[in-house]
Amino acid sequence: MNKLPLAKRAQILSLLCEGSSMRSIERIVGCSINTVDKLLRDAGEVALAYHDEQVRGVKAIRVQCDEIWSFVAVKQKNRVTSKRATDPTAGDCWTWTAIEAQSKLLISYLIGSRDAEYALMLMDDLRGRLANRVQLTTDGHKAYLQAVEEAFGADIDYSMLIKLYGEPPSSPEAPRRYSPSDCVGTRTEKITGNPDPKHVSTSYAERANLTMRMRCAGSPG
């Protein structure tokens, strides 16, 4: 069985990190797309295990949470009429992230639905990786309320940063927009403990999610 040289494996991973598609990597490196796919999966499993083992006992100060939308094969609204109508893995999916505001360390993350079950999974995982009480900021997604309470109880300083949106656009293109209406302001809501109002923010988490989206844009084959 042929084994890909280390230099080529490093080149493939480097190109993947730069956002190159698997098809383009196949052409550049001169290997099959199955090889690229297997290396991507293997590297992902190693990274997952490394993060799970090493990101423990984190002495964080402020943590910000956010979710980023994507879809598998077909958007949820089009799934019923698509060829993937009976595929339980198809449709909308969300990447949940919890980032430490000072170091920008991604403490916890998961992929799934944007519902209470996954909110609790994120908060339980976050709680298990922290070494101390932190200030937490999330957006206004209601699923966080019960999740934070169940995971942390009163041992947290928690605020929501709620965005206020204007009227939805009335142009013919409006139904095809991915994003909501323009944000016209924000308000904060203290939920638990004594969060510092000066540090109620999700800016770092949102910036990290934008970077994730841009770097992953070319990754599908």
Regions found by a protein language model. Give the residues of each.
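Residue-level recognition of single "structural anchor" positions
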Residues: M1-G221
